[in-house]
Amino acid sequence: MPPPPHIKPENVLKRAQELIAVGQAPAALNVLHEHVTSKRTRSSPIVSLEPVMLLFVELCVDLRKGKAAKDGLYQYKNIAQNTNVATIEVVLKKFIELAEKKVTEAQAKADEIQSSLESAAPSSNVEDLEAIETPETILLATVSGEQSRDRTDRAVVTPWLKFLWETYRTVLEILKNNARLEVMYQTTALQAFQFCLKYTRKTEFRRLCELLRNHVQNAAKYSAQMHAINLSDPDTLQRHLDTRFQQLNVAVELELWQEAFRSIEDIHTLLSLSKRPAKNVMMANYYEKLARIFLVSENYLFHAAAWSRYYNLLRQSAATLAAGQGTKKENPSVTDADMTKAVSFVLLSALAIPVISTSRSRGALVDVDEVRKNKNTRLTNLLGMAQSPTRAVLFKDALNKGLLKRARPEIRDLYNILEVDFHPLSICKKITPILKQIGADPEMEKYVVPLQQVILTRLFQQLSQVYESVSLKFVYELAQFPDPFQVTPAMIEKFIMNGCKKGDLAIRVDHISGVLTFDTDVFSSAKALHSGSAAGSAESEVGSVQRMQNTPAEIARLQLTRLAKTLHVSCMYVDPSYHEARLQAKQAAQTRAAAGAAKEHEETLARRVIIDKKKEAATDALQRKQREEETRKRIRTQQLQEAEKQRLLDEQREREKKRIKDEQDRIREQELKKQIEELKSGVKGIDLSEVDLKDLDANRLRAMKLAQLEKEKNELNDRIRTTGKRIDHLERAFRREELKHIPADYEAQKKRDMELYEALKAETLKEAEDKHKEAVALKHRLSRLVPVFNNFRKEVSEKRHEEFERRRKAAERDFEAKKKQRIKEVQDRRRRERAEREEAERRQKEEEERIKREEEERAAKEEERRRVLAEEKAKREEERKKLDEIALKQKQREEEAEARRASRKTGFPEPPARAEPERTAPRLNLAPRTGGGPSWRERQAAKEAAGGAAPEPAKEEPAAQPPRRTGGYVPPHLRGASAAAPAAPPSNGAAPSRYVPPSARDSGSSTPPSRTQTPATTSEEPKSAGKWVPRWKQQQGQ
């Protein structure tokens, strides 16, 4: 069954509009809230649900129902974030716009109420929007009867301001840590900052900063969730940086310096996570705000360092723009006036750094060095510096960059007076016009007080070097400043006491005699003598103080140093060898340094190469790790998406099952109600008031109905039986009494029936006569129309017959035409089929002929290939025969050489060498004797065989070959000669006992041929196989 009509969003929207039209806005909001938060809404289409949400947020704003709006918007985000993100942004923007509109209307209403008053800052006296009504305000409202502007704003504007603040916070909570909604999140955060700035909401700004900070912290904690933001993404990180910079600007505008410093820390944390460098315009804003924060916190050292970093950034941006490597959007626009101003502030802030620490603290005896070190490390990291700044380093950096030339004249003169040419007696006269110029500038006026501290420090340092005691009046006269910046004696004494408490000054004040006494103890610590070296000082360089002359304490303290120097010079004059040894050692060290410079340079280059390789390997490993991480993250994201899809499918199935079950329960309940109503209306006496409908079912109702019917039937039978007994007696009495009156009643009945019959008969006859007369008259009246009717019927019949004949002939013509057409189609079809069949047979025949022709061509090609192979084989046979003849000649020459060697061994004379005639017969392959060299008869027979014609080949069987050797060298021309003949032992059964030449080991029989035996021709020589055969294969073939 389809769902109930009220479940559809269109019906809910229509119902809510109807309720709004009759003035029932809360009821309409409840209807919309129930529909939005219902589980059935998840399956509704977003297109139809968006108008419902727009009306829902509008009612929530009108009725100031922030909690209901939060619940509905959370539910709507969960429904639409996987399908359509734009609709979430539309609804949330509408929500914020309506809340802002209500605040504007409330302000206009308050202005109308208090038109005579002007307000520069609405609701400025309300410190906390979440704690508006305090006991004081309630008492004031009770006692006071006048209507002030503050009370009007508190009653009219402040509730809507509170609702607008709740709106921003709700929207930020809904959009947090969602990568698909982070643009809307940033926009809402910027709007919330503007809200705090416009209405001067400092408390809400602190809560907003903490809320955003918690969101960023939770982003790393819940990074594995679906649609979680990734701070490694440059675009996401840039959006958060933009938000934090706006937060920093608003904090500075509201003068919330603690929140501004925490914003600085947030920005520094995000910058450390960023892979791309920040824009120069953003960093310029960063250093400018940081300098203002340090100035407010009276940390003049890091304030000057921030100004130095700011100036370096401006100079870098100017150089980048001049080189055309950057854009004006990414780099701050810098003019000569801006550069001069920045340089002046760099020098002025460096001059304002206290030489000694004069702030109120527990003194140098407390162990606070570790805390100060950690604090300085944090501030140094915020400035992006490698080491903590110092006063001397800042001045050195400024002088190296030539900032004095670009600074304003009064700042340049102030530097010369304080750091170059400081004279305690004329310092105040020289510096008075400069302080007046600085005090006239509102931005530089803040540096007058720290400059006074520096001047006093320099003054007492110089006085301590010249005087042992001075009068207080003299000191007061020296420390005279211009009129707006005068220093009272109390302030001077306070300065002295703080310096002495820190251990940076060693001064005693005698108010009775009015004298200032400087500590002249010879054995006093060097800390009191060298201001700025203490733990609480802002400066640790002793040389920064101008030394006019040494004090007695310094003379006593440096006595050993002077004595050591004097003795060293005396030794150099008394013992020249000592000086020469020092010079030789120095020269040897220089020689060693020069000799090892090249090697050290090579080692440095090699180390640099190794470092580069390690860097490349580390970079590759990092990139590989990043790729693997991205792959794992992508796989994890896919798994999460699949899990989310599976979860949504499971939820949808569960919702469908629940819907079907609810529908079945609803139908069953309706059926039960219907059956109960039928049971109540159909069966009397049944009571269902105490029966629970949840426990009922159809079977139980049927059983109850049957039981009640059985009960009613039994009661009816009892009543019938009782009534029957009673009626039997009455009926018997009634019938006995009737028997007396039946005859008279029968006669009266017959009489009444006869009278009634006669009346009905007369009436029937009269009606029949009247109808007959009317029919006769009608017949006479219509008889005149009979000829006309017959003619008309005849005409109609003839026309219809003609029409029938015409249609029948047309049908016959159509039938004949269609019959001919059908015959023609059949003939064409048969003709076409015959042609197709003949074409198929022709194609088949052509295909068979083509296959046959291809087979013939293939056979011809195969025959040609075989012929070519045969020719090539014949050529190879001829070449192999030639090679065999060459081998035989070589073999003959080897045998002759062997025979000559054998003859030399046995003592026979070597036959004379003669030119061999050209042989026409093949060389004989005669095996030598086994007992020794060839005999004379054998050599003569060989000569005759070589000189005569080749005899006929022998017809007898070849002799058995000697057993083949399993090892040793085998000539190439004999490796395949005897492969076909099996090995056999010698005919006489004895192994040869004499040396057998290699050429005759495997050829012929073991016994020498007979002197009368005809040698074999070359045709009987074993033919070479034409290719090399391995020895193991030869042995296997044997």
Curated annotation (Swiss-Prot):
GO terms for molecular function: mRNA binding; translation initiation factor activity. One of its GO terms (cellular component) is cytoplasmic stress granule. One of its GO terms (biological process) is translation reinitiation. The keyword Lipoprotein does not apply. Residues 621-641, 800-1038 are annotated as: Disordered. Residues 339-523 form the PCI domain. Residues 943-952, 976-993 have a biased composition (Low complexity). It is found in: Cytoplasm. Signal peptide: none annotated. InterPro entries: EIF3A (IPR027512), eIF3a_PCI_TPR-like (IPR054711), PCI_dom (IPR000717). The keyword Membrane does not apply. Keywords: Coiled coil, Cytoplasm, Initiation factor, Protein biosynthesis, RNA-binding. Residues 1002-1019 have a biased composition (Polar residues). Pfam families: eIF3a_PCI_TPR-like, PCI. Disulfide bonds: none annotated. Residues 621-632, 800-901 have a biased composition (Basic and acidic residues). Residues 92-121, 611-899 form a coiled coil. Belongs to the eIF-3 subunit A family. RNA-binding component of the eukaryotic translation initiation factor 3 (eIF-3) complex, which is involved in protein synthesis of a specialized repertoire of mRNAs and, together with other initiation factors, stimulates binding of mRNA and methionyl-tRNAi to the 40S ribosome. The eIF-3 complex specifically targets and initiates translation of a subset of mRNAs involved in cell proliferation. This is Eukaryotic translation initiation factor 3 subunit A.
